[in-house]
């Protein structure tokens, strides 16, 4: 402690004497703690007719857009990813829906289910995430209380104009998972046109490459739909206009044309199951000389159906009128010098990517990185 000493002397002057001042005895002050900033997690969800894709807490996931609905009387396994209850009804989505029996099956592409079952696809995304709900169960500890979660949602959908129906799905997100009750409070949401995340990634690519493009285009091949969207590359963010979609022209239809071609002629008594042909398509390749390869396992042997796959792709692009006209439109656009970016799970398949790129025949065509997930990660 600092002191000052004052005392009398014989000559009338004063000498220092020890005293304490208030400032010396006051306790040290500390700066007030800043309140912790609470970050509300954001679920980016792309509810496709074939697969539902999501991005949450830096993890990308997807599951087949299929759900199995169970009555109150039917018991469900506990702790399985993608298995949950909403009200008195049980649900299983994706692989869990395919592995369980009983109940009623609903698929994303049927009966307007992308919107009608939007609450199921949202909860299904949370319940298939490998850690999101489990971390909150651990933090909540033991007990029967409702675990409340604030959440932001970004939804990519061709049905983004149906705002009231979408808001209805957000209004009551209460469910049970792993024997715990959850309640989701959607604090905010944004609706984006399908393919918008890919458009953001395309705009970034143009900027990084020093391009001055006023317009660019995104060609999105998903499980159920082929979509072409032109974008304006001005005023900060990409702006879509005149979106053209061919419903029923996605990878599922390509697989169907492949199956039709594979079954022609003498198959040697082999039966090509749709799921095996789908696997052969997904693992297909194209050599530098342009030879297609699509191997399918038949018992102890393997057969290459590459020539049948190429024939199937040709039939798909020729016999579906919407596909034929859309691809012709894109070829005309390329002649004007405007870039076209390929995205969607279909362009993850090498044979499909090679076929369409070769058909379009232009150096202005580029495939975005990770085309199966860029549409959601591009929004982050």
Task: Give the ranges of each region predicted by the language model.
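An amphipathic alpha-helix signature
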Residues: 252-259
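A mobile "lid/hinge" subdomain adjacent to the ATP/sugar-phosphate binding pocket shared
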Residues: 260-312
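Nucleotide/phosphate-binding catalytic cleft detector across ATP-hydrolyzing
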Residues: 1-217, 235-251, 292-339, 347-380
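A structural feature that tracks compact, well-ordered secondary-structure segments
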Residues: 227-231
């Amino acid at each position: 402690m600092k002191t000052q000493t004052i005392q009398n002397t014989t000559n009338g002057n004063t000498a220092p004497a020890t005293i304490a001042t208030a400032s010396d005895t006051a306790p040290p002050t500390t700066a007030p703690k800043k309140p912790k900033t609470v970050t509300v997690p954001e679920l980016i969800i792309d509810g496709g007719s074939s697969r539902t894709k999501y991005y949450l807490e830096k993890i990308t996931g997807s599951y087949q857009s299929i759900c199995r609905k169970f009555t109150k009387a039917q018991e469900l396994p506990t702790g399985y990813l993608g298995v949950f209850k909403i009200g008195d009804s049980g649900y299983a989505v994706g692989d869990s829906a395919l592995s369980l029996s009983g109940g009623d099956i609903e698929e994303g592409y049927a009966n307007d289910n992308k919107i009608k079952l939007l609450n199921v696809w949202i909860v299904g995304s949370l319940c298939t995430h490998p850690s999101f709900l489990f971390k909150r169960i651990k933090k909540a500890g033991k007990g029967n209380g409702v675990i409340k979660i604030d959440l932001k949602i970004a939804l990519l959908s061709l049905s983004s104009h149906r705002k009231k129906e979408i808001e209805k799905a957000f209004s009551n997100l209460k469910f049970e998972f792993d024997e715990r009750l959850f309640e989701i409070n959607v604090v905010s949401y944004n609706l984006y046109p399908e393919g918008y995340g890919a458009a953001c990634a395309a705009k970034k690519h143009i900027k990084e490459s020093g391009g001055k493009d006023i317009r660019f285009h995104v060609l999105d091949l998903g499980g159920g739909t082929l979509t072409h969207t032109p974008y304006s590359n001005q005023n900060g963010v990409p702006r879509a206009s005149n979106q053209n979609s061919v419903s029923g022209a996605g990878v599922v239809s390509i697989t169907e044309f492949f199956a039709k071609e594979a079954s022609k002629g003498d198959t040697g008594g082999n039966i090509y199951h749709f799921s095996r042909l789908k696997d052969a398509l997904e693992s297909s390749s194209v050599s530098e000389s342009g030879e297609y390869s699509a191997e399918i396992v038949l018992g102890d042997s393997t057969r290459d159906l590459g020539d049948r796959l190429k024939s199937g792709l040709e039939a798909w692009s020729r016999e579906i009128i919407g596909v034929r006209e859309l691809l012709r439109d894109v070829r005309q656009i390329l002649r004007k010098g405007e870039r076209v970016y390929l995205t969607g799970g279909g362009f993850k398949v090498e044979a499909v990517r090679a076929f369409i790129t070769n058909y379009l025949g232009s150096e202005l065509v580029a495939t975005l990185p990770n085309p199966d997930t860029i549409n959601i990660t591009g929004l982050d």
